Amino acid sequence: MNRIYRLIFILCAFCGIAQAQPERPKLVVGIVIDQMRWDYLYRYYARYGEGGFKRMLGEGFSVENCQIPYIPSVTAIGHSCVWTGSVPSIHGIAGNAFVKDGKIVNCVGDNTVKPVGSDGKAGYMSPRNLWVTTIGDELRLATNNRSKVVGVALKDRAAILPAGHHANGVYWFDDKAGRFITSTFYMDKLPEWVNKFNKRKLAEKYLSQKWETLYPIDTYQ
């Protein structure tokens, strides 16, 4: 009888191990670099920082031969395909601009919203033209909106399309105003941390300086 109890105990212990769930990451960062081919990761390997791409290549997981069949290869379609896992006929983004109801429209243009942080036309943007959910949207749904999803980029489409419909905040750069903005699709006013960043006027500072390469110019190919 003792042997039977011992056997049951051991089996239960193994069951507990088998059902143990891996610890979920607290932060997921998605980075898309325009026009950076996959082979550049290795071509310029010696120039990466130890805690950046080198760490990802050394400790991360590489998904190779992953192809999404679409054309043309433009920014808006690329972001939409990567972050939705679908193609233009499914996610609805057919270009940086495309014909909708007989008119050429910006892929993220939306006249039903208002700019926040600017008075210019750069703020009339939202993800309404995107027909499906993104990774960020699914993360929000899976956690009952407890997850925080934020999109930031210089281009509006590069910030809006990856973040999706249910992001907590999406910010892009208005090159006319010289600051980061958003639209009423997401919020009615900019967070204080965005206002503080804008007040630093870094764009003006950088434009007044001479552009220098990180390494000697003759070492670039």
Language model features with spans:
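Second-shell loop/turn segments in exported
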Residues: R37-R43, I68, K121-P127
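Extracytoplasmic/secreted cell-surface and envelope-processing proteins
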Residues: W38-Y42, T75, A159-A163
